[in-house]
Amino acid sequence: MNYFELFKFSPAFDIDTAVLAERYRELQRAVHPDKFAHDTEQQKLLSVQRTAQVNDGYQTLKDPIRRAEHLLSLRGIDLSHETTTVKDTVFLMQQMEWREALEDIRHSTDPQESIDELYQSFAEYRAKLTYMLTAQLNSSKDEDALLAADQVRKLKFMAKLHDELTRIEDALLD
């Protein structure tokens, strides 16, 4: 299913999330199972299925990584069950530095400063990746779609690192 069509957007990485939320509410009202309470079982089932599609579509388009994956899937690149790893050596070296920095937080004299610095580093790198991803997804070239897939892999890794940093910060605050 093309969620961009469902929500009446052109397939693009940059979408107006306020408009997305508004269209989500409109679609929810139109397909909500309560509207079909007195209809046939088949119509009730169809309503439940449409509601699930609308919910999944909203969650997909709302999340930048899932939105990028959806755009790539529309171009024939499926990352949903992928096990391919990033082969970019510069990124792998940066990844190792971040992992070391995460380990060093526990032994830091000012762990909150270290945490803040890592959050800032992650945000800057994610912004750079997102900028490149946007350009690659807006391109119609197949090689740019493959490069975009690599950016998505990196962003997924960055999301995991961010979650790990948040867990470390929460543990230090407890």
UniProtKB/Swiss-Prot annotation:
Domain J, residue spans: 2-74
One Gene Ontology term, aspect cellular component: iron-sulfur cluster transfer complex
GO biological process, one term: protein folding
GO molecular function per UniProt: ATPase activator activity; protein-folding chaperone binding
UniProt keywords, alphabetically: Chaperone
Entries under Pfam families matching the protein: HSCB_C
UniProt similarity note: Belongs to the HscB family.
UniProt function note: Co-chaperone involved in the maturation of iron-sulfur cluster-containing proteins. Seems to help targeting proteins to be folded toward HscA.
HAMAP family: HscB
NCBIfam families: hscB (TIGR00714), PRK05014.1 (NF003449)
PANTHER family (alphabetical): IRON-SULFUR CLUSTER CO-CHAPERONE PROTEIN HSCB
Quaternary organization: Interacts with HscA and stimulates its ATPase activity.
This protein's name: Co-chaperone protein HscB homolog
Species this protein is from: Shewanella sp. (strain W3-18-1)
